[in-house]
């Protein structure tokens, strides 16, 4: 969610998501640059299918006037949404992890979960009668979410806008998530590699160079700003013919 700035300059921003009873608090500061990027206050960590209470404080600047503001918002966040495959073991959309024990040292942690749903009629459009496949052989839908140490989902990725099960170039298993130094995430799937921030803002979404196919598992950021991708060669020269190579 974004709490819009209404055209005012706002600084010294602090956000707190009021936790559920016995829940985990999420609180953070927002830089002036991020406030400009989003046109307001980015709100992260809302409980899904729940009316959240969000407390914000900031300095409102209008000319020479500076005003310290504290506000509280009630924001409903929609339910978690992942692909429904028809599999017998899929009974709901939530991840429902069972928390066994939380060490006090780790109780404020958040965990990014990257899970794959098995292929189904919807998520396996390019694997009919072909036992070899490539990255698309494992083309089930993705379950990407961030959970807290109480087992609650605090963020999830709706993949529909970027993942098209009916397109060879826009489907495949989402793998290789890595948080970069700027906070944004890089990952890849099928014939693509991407970078988005946690609020869903696209930084880039690119097709693999045409000499390569079938991204899987690893997209690593280098110190110099380049990226290493695990892919296959689109055409490897053999004695009498060319053939796609295995990944690596």
Which sequence ranges carry the predicted segments?
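Ligand-binding face of N-terminal immunoglobulin V-set domains in extracellular IgSF glycoproteins
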Residues: 40-45
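Short beta-strand segments enriched for Tyr within beta-sheet-rich domains
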Residues: 46, 50-58
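Aromatic (tryptophan-biased) beta-strands that constitute blades/sheets of beta-rich domains
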Residues: 54, 71, 75-106, 111-113, ...
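Structural signature of eukaryotic scaffold interfaces centered on beta-propeller domains
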Residues: 92-105, 173-181, 220-223
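Beta-propeller domains
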Residues: 119-164, 193-197
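Conserved small/polar residues in nucleotide/adenosyl-binding loops
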Residues: 241-248
């Amino acid at each position: 969610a974004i709490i819009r700035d209404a055209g005012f300059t706002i600084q010294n921003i602090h956000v707190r998501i009021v936790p559920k009873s016995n829940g985990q608090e999420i609180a953070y500061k927002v830089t002036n640059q991020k406030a400009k990027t989003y046109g307001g206050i980015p709100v992260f960590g809302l409980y899904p299918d729940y009316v959240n209470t969000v407390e914000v404080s900031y300095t409102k600047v209008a000319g020479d006037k500076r005003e310290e503001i504290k506000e509280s918002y009630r924001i409903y966040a929609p339910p978690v949404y992942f692909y429904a495959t028809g599999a017998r073991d899929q009974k709901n959309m939530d991840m429902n992890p069972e928390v066994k024990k939380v060490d006090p040292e780790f109780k404020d942690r958040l965990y990014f979960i990257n899970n794959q749903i098995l292929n189904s009629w919807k998520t396996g459009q390019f694997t009919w009668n072909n036992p070899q496949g490539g990255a698309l052989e494992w083309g089930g839908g993705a379950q990407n979410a961030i959970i807290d140490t109480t087992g609650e989902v605090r963020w999830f990725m709706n993949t529909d806008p970027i993942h098209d099960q009916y397109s060879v170039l826009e489907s495949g298993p989402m793998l290789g998530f890595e948080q970069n130094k700027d906070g944004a995430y890089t990952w890849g799937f099928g014939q693509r590699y991407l970078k988005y921030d946690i609020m869903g803002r696209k930084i880039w979404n690119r097709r693999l160079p045409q000499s390569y196919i079938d991204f899987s598992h690893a997209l690593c950021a280098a110190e110099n700003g380049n990226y290493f991708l695990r892919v296959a060669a689109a055409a490897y020269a053999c004695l009498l013919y060319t053939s796609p190579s295995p990944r690596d």
